[in-house]
C-alpha cells in the first residue's frame, strides 16, 4: 500500500472517529456512533499494517490475534457493574504503551538528523514517557480504588501540593539536561529518573483524590490516555494517532470540566490532585438520629397511591443488577397513569454516564431519564422518591454542613418530596465515607436488604 493511500485511509478513519464521538453524544445515535468507531479503527489498522513503513507483518498479526482474543474474553466476562474498573485498567495499558514506545523511539532514532530535529525528537520522547507513566500508575490506582483493593479514602500526605510542584520542577530540569547533553549515559540517567518520578507522581495524584469523585478521575485519566496516545503518535510520526489522541484527550478534558462545574469543584484541583478533600470532617459512622424502616409491601402501597414518582439510582443499583426489575416497576406504574421519572446525578456510579448506560440496557424510555439540573426543582411536588443504591449524591450535608468533605457539591434534593424510600443494605456510609442525615429525616423510610431482592418484592406486590 502506497504512502498516499495510507494517508487517505487515515483521513477517512479520523473523520469516522469524529462521527463516532458525535454519535455517542446522544442515546438515539449511540449504536451508529459505535459502528463508526469500529469502522474507523478497522481502516486504521489495515492501513497501518500494510503501509510502506511496516515490517514483520507476521508478528503484528500475531499480536493482534492475542490482543483480540483477550479483548473478546473480557467483553464476554466483564459485567456492566465492572465496567469502571475495566475502563481504568485499559487507560493504564495506553499509558504503558506510550512509555514503551518512548524508550523504543529513543533507542532507535534516525542518525544524521539536523540538531533542531534531534532536540524536537528528544522532547517528544521525554514528554511522551512522562505523560504515559503518569497515566499508567494513576490508572492502576484508580482500578484498585474502584475494585476495593485500595482504600477509597484520599491519601493526605503533608505538603502534598508542594511535593507535586517539586516533581514537576525536577522533571523540567531533567528535560533540559536530557535535550542539551551529548552524553548518552547522562541522557539515559535523566530519562530513568524522570520515569521514576512520573510513576510516583501519577500514583500520588490519584491516591490523594477522594473515592466519591472517582467518575471525574476516570474521565480525567481518559484525557491523560488520549494525550499519551498523541505523544506516541508524534514519536512514531503517525498522523492518525496524533489526531485520535487529541480527540480523546480534549473530549476527556471537556467532560472532566463539565462534571466539575456540575459538582461546584475547581477543574485545577482535579489536575493537581486532592480533589474533594479540603473538608475538615472525617465523616464518621456516628448516627445523627433515629431511622424508620418500611417493608416492600408498604412501599408498593405507597407507590400505588402516588401521582408522581422519581427514582434516583446509584452504584448500589448497578452492583445488585436491579435495573431490570426497576424498569418493570416503571412500566407497571406508568400503566396506572402515575408520572414516573428518573433523576440522574452527574457523578452517580463509578464513571460518567454509568446510570444512563444501565437504564438504557434495561430499555427504560430515555425521555423520562433526566439530569439533576432538569429535575431538582420537581422534588417538592413529588409524592414518592425511591433512592436505589445512591448515598452521597442525595446527601443534604453537602448543603447544610460547611465542614463536610462533600460541602458545596450539588445534590439531588430528594428530601423535599412527601415520602422518601431509601434502599440500602445497612446504615453504613457511602463511598465518600460521610454519614447521610437524609436517613434520619421524618419523611424518610429505610428499606434494608439487597436492592434487587427489594425491588423484586415490590414488583410482586404491585
From Swiss-Prot:
Annotated membrane topology is:
Multi-pass membrane protein
- Please give the Gene3D superfamilies that the UniProt record associates with this protein: TPP-binding domain
Q: What class of enzyme is it?
A: translocase
Its subcellular locations are: Cell inner membrane
- The residues forming a coiled coil are none
Q: Which residues cross the membrane?
A: 4-24, 46-66, 83-103, 116-136, 165-185, 189-209, 216-236, 240-260, 309-329
Source superkingdom: Bacteria
Q: Keywords on this record?
A: Cell inner membrane, Cell membrane, Membrane, NAD, NADP, Translocase, Transmembrane, Transmembrane helix
Q: Which organism is it from?
A: Escherichia coli (strain K12)
Instruction: Family membership, please give it.
Output: Belongs to the PNT beta subunit family.
Q: Subunit structure, briefly?
A: Heterodimer of an alpha and a beta chain.
Task: Please provide, in alphabetical order, the Gene Ontology terms of the cellular component aspect for this entry.
Answer: plasma membrane
Cite the source lineage.
Bacteria, Pseudomonadati, Pseudomonadota, Gammaproteobacteria, Enterobacterales
The stretches that face the Periplasmic side, renumbered to this chain, are 1-3, 67-82, 137-164, 210-215, 261-308
* NCBIfam families in the record: PRK09444.1
**What name does this protein carry?**
NAD(P) transhydrogenase subunit beta
Q: What is its main location?
A: membrane
Under InterPro entries, the record lists: DHS-like_NAD/FAD-binding_dom (IPR029035), NADH_DH_b (IPR012136), PNTB-like (IPR034300)
Its EC number(s): 7.1.1.1
Mind listing the GO biological process terms from this record?
A: NADPH regeneration; proton export across plasma membrane
Catalytic activity of the protein = NAD(+) + NADPH + H(+)(in) = NADH + NADP(+) + H(+)(out)
Q: Summarize the protein's role.
A: The transhydrogenation between NADH and NADP is coupled to respiration and ATP hydrolysis and functions as a proton pump across the membrane.
List all topological domains (Cytoplasmic).
25-45, 104-115, 186-188, 237-239, 330-462
Picking any one GO molecular function of the record gives: proton-translocating NAD(P)+ transhydrogenase activity
Amino acid at each position: 500500500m502506497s504512502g498516499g493511500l495510507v494517508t487517505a485511509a487515515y483521513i477517512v478513519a479520523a473523520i469516522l472517529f469524529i462521527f463516532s464521538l458525535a454519535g455517542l453524544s446522544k442515546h438515539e445515535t449511540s449504536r451508529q456512533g459505535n459502528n463508526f468507531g469500529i469502522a474507523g479503527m478497522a481502516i486504521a489498522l489495515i492501513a497501518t499494517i500494510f503501509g510502506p513503513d511496516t515490517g514483520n507483518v507476521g508478528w503484528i498479526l500475531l499480536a493482534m490475534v492475542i490482543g483480540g482474543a483477550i479483548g473478546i474474553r473480557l467483553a464476554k466476562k466483564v459485567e456492566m457493574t465492572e465496567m469502571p474498573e475495566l475502563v481504568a485498567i485499559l487507560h493504564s495499558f495506553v499509558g504503558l504503551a506510550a512509555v514503551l514506545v518512548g524508550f523504543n523511539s529513543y533507542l532507535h532514532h534516525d542518525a544524521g538528523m539536523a540538531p533542531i530535529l534531534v532536540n524536537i525528537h528528544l522532547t517528544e520522547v521525554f514528554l511522551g514517557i512522562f505523560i504515559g507513566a503518569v497515566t499508567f500508575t494513576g490508572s492502576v490506582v484508580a482500578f484498585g480504588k474502584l475494585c476495593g483493593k485500595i482504600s477509597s479514602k484520599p491519601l493526605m500526605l503533608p505538603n502534598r501540593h508542594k511535593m507535586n510542584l517539586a516533581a514537576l520542577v525536577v522533571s523540567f530540569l531533567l528535560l533540559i539536561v536530557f535535550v542539551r547533553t551529548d552524553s548518552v549515559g547522562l541522557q539515559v540517567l535523566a530519562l530513568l529518573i524522570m520515569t521514576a518520578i512520573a510513576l510516583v507522581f501519577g500514583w500520588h495524584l490519584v491516591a490523594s483524590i477522594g473515592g466519591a469523585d472517582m467518575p471525574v478521575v476516570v474521565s480525567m485519566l481518559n484525557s491523560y490516555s488520549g494525550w499519551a496516545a498523541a505523544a506516541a503518535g508524534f514519536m512514531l510520526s503517525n498522523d492518525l494517532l496524533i489526531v485520535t489522541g487529541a480527540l480523546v484527550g480534549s473530549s476527556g478534558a471537556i467532560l472532566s470540566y463539565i462534571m466539575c462545574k456540575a459538582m461546584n469543584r475547581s477543574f485545577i484541583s482535579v489536575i493537581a490532585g486532592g480533589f474533594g478533600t479540603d473538608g475538615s470532617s472525617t465523616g464518621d459512622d456516628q448516627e445523627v438520629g433515629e431511622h424508620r424502616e418500611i417493608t416492600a409491601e408498604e412501599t408498593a402501597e405507597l407507590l400505588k397511591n402516588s401521582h408522581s414518582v422519581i427514582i434516583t439510582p446509584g452504584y448500589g443499583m448497578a452492583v445488585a443488577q436491579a435495573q431490570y426489575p426497576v424498569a418493570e416497576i416503571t412500566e407497571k406504574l406508568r400503566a396506572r397513569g402515575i408520572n414516573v421519572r428518573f433523576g440522574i446525578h452527574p457523578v452517580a456510579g463509578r464513571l460518567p454516564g454509568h446510570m444512563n448506560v444501565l437504564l438504557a440496557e434495561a430499555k427504560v424510555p430515555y425521555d423520562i431519564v433526566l439530569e439533576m439540573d432538569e429535575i431538582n426543582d420537581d422534588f417538592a411536588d413529588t409524592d414518592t422518591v425511591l433512592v436505589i443504591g445512591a448515598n452521597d449524591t442525595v446527601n443534604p450535608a453537602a448543603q447544610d454542613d460547611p465542614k463536610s468533605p462533600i460541602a458545596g457539591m450539588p445534590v439531588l434534593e430528594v428530601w423535599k418530596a412527601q415520602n422518601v424510600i431509601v434502599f440500602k443494605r445497612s446504615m453504613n456510609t457511602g463511598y465518600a465515607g460521610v454519614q447521610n442525615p437524609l436517613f434520619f429525616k421524618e419523611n424518610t423510610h429505610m428499606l434494608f436488604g439487597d436492592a434487587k431482592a427489594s425491588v423484586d418484592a415490590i414488583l410482586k406486590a404491585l
